[in-house]
Amino acid sequence: MKRIAFVFSTTPHGSASGREGLDALLATSALTEETGVFFIGDGVFQILSGQTPDVVLARDYIATFKLLGLYDIEQCWLCAASLRERGLETGASFIVDATPLEPEALRGELDNYDVILRF
């Protein structure tokens, strides 16, 4: 079975990309257990807690990321450099238990996947 990586690299409420990626991730998890999730660049905002999307009239799909554990999706990583660049390395609270990795280590993890889908 192919290993599939989902890379979230966009902000959560600027487009439908994050929501569509999450839908694809949950659907794919029914077909394979070899799934990894990566949050890089602005994608680190996808799982930042305390967001209020209703202020910009957006749907709060962020809470759906909490379901990853129920779908047995446990391989989640954050880009440590992206966190630093956005001032999120200390005190930030995330709704998913994701492991921060430096870019080189993150690339090493991504190399373990056969298919990479970017949202």
From Swiss-Prot:
Any one Pfam family match given in the protein's UniProt record, by short name: DsrE
Entry-linked InterPro entries: DsrEFH-like, Sulphur_relay_DsrE/F-like, Sulphur_relay_TusC, Sulphur_relay_TusC/DsrF
Keyword Transmembrane helix: no
Segments passing through the bilayer: none
Keywords: Cytoplasm, tRNA processing
Swiss-Prot/TrEMBL GO biological process terms: tRNA processing
Localization: Cytoplasm
First-listed, main subcellular location of the protein, grouped into a coarse class: cytoplasm
Gene Ontology annotations for the cellular component aspect, listed alphabetically: cytoplasm
Family stated for the protein in its record: Belongs to the DsrF/TusC family.
Subunit structure: Heterohexamer, formed by a dimer of trimers. The hexameric TusBCD complex contains 2 copies each of TusB, TusC and TusD. The TusBCD complex interacts with TusE.
HAMAP family listed in its UniProt record: Thiourid_synth_C
Function: Part of a sulfur-relay system required for 2-thiolation of 5-methylaminomethyl-2-thiouridine (mnm(5)s(2)U) at tRNA wobble positions.
Protein name: Protein TusC
Origin species: Citrobacter koseri (strain ATCC BAA-895 / CDC 4225-83 / SGSC4696)
